[in-house]
Amino acid sequence: TIICAVSALCIVTTLNGFEYKRPSSLNKIMFSGEVMPIKHLNAWRVQYPDAMFVNLYGPTEITCNCTYYIIDREFGLDEKLPMGKPFANERVFRLDDEDKLVDAGRPGELGEICVSGTAVTMGYLRNPEKTAAAFVQNPLNDRYLETIYRTGDLVYYSEDGELFFSSR
C-alpha cells in the first residue's frame, strides 16, 4: 500500500520513474493533497492494473482526509475525479454565501465545503483570529454546540450526484 501526495506520484510518471525501479507489490494506491491529473492516474493504472486506487480529499485542519472515492472505472483525459463520500466519522456538506445548505438536488451550483465530525481539530495554535474565522458553529444547527471547519474550497454536485472539487 502507498499513500502519497499527488505531486509525488506525478514526479514518478513525469521522470519515467517506472523505467528505473518499479515496486512489485503495491495493492492499494491512495492519493491526496491536490487534484490528481487523469494523465498521471492512467499511467499508474497501467503499471498496477490490479491495485485499488483511491482519491482522497481533506485539509490538514480535519486531520487530513474526510472523503474517499474508490476508482472503479477508466477516466478520459477530459474528465475529473469525484471527491467521493465522507468517512464514517465525518459529515461533509456545502453552504452557499448565505450559510444555507446546497444539497445534491442542485447540481452544478457551487458551495463551500464544510466538515464536522470527530477529526475536526481545535483550531490554529496561537492564532485565535484565524481559528474564529474557520472553526465556527454550524449555521444549520441551533440546538447544540457543533463546531464545523469551513474549508474555503468550492465544490459542486454533478447531475448524477457525485461531488467534485472546483477551486480554492
Each predicted region: which residue ranges?
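Adenylate-forming
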Residues: 1-82, 87-102, 129
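AMP-dependent adenylate-forming
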Residues: 46, 52-55, 70-168
